[in-house]
Regions:
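Conserved catalytic-core motifs of GNAT/GCN5-like acyltransferases
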Residues: 100, 113, 118-134
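Acetyl-CoA-dependent GNAT
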Residues: 2-71, 82-84, 88-92, 138-142
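Short glycine/proline-centered loop/turn elements that form peptide/ligand docking sites
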Residues: 82, 105-108, 125-130
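Conserved GNAT acetyl-CoA-binding A-motif
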Residues: 89-100, 123
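A short, internal acetyl-CoA/4′-phosphopantetheine-binding micro-motif in the GNAT/acyltransferase core
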Residues: 66-74, 101-104
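Conserved catalytic core of the tyrosine transesterase superfamily
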Residues: 37, 96, 102, 131, ...
Length: 143
């Protein structure tokens, strides 16, 4: 997905709002512009209100971030973003997608499990104040 300067500004605003500045503008720009990256965005009235960003390396996808502005949550946007991200990853040859989430992020965990992700691992003490849970969704079985 190629972004205009205004679209990138909106994307960065969503990232900052949802993740409290976990990525710098430069980091987000680098990831968005990487040939390995997959970006999907949701818009309302021409404004980006949510996005999902990941990448595909060989046959594995990884979800880096998914965020929806608070006033647009609980409307199915995150599910739609994940579905589109998975479709694009599959087009690029991915057979599965991995993600990592804070163990106390109940809302995100509920979304991922609803969308078919399975918990495969726990990284104790990964964050200063929390563990990380690793999830995987298989798009198709490998031989």
């Amino acid at each position: 997905m190629t972004l205009t300067d205004e679209q990138f500004r909106q994307l960065y605003e969503v990232e900052q709002t949802c993740f409290h500045g976990s990525w710098s503008r430069e980091t987000l720009s680098t990831e968005v512009n990487s040939p390995l990256s997959v970006l999907v965005a949701a818009q309302r009235d021409g404004r980006i209100v949510g996005f999902a960003l990941g990448r595909v390396v060989v046959d594995e996808g990884e979800l880096y971030q998914i965020g929806v502005l608070p006033e647009f949550r609980r409307q199915g946007i995150a599910e739609a973003l994940l579905s589109e991200l998975h479709a694009r990853m599959t087009e690029r040859g991915a057979v599965c997608c991995f993600l990592e989430v804070r163990s106390r992020n109940a809302g995100a965990i509920a979304l991922y499990e609803k969308c078919g992700y399975e918990r495969i691992s726990l990284r104790k003490g990964y964050y200063d104040d929390d563990d990380a849970v690793i999830y995987r969704k298989k798009f198709r079985e490998t031989s």
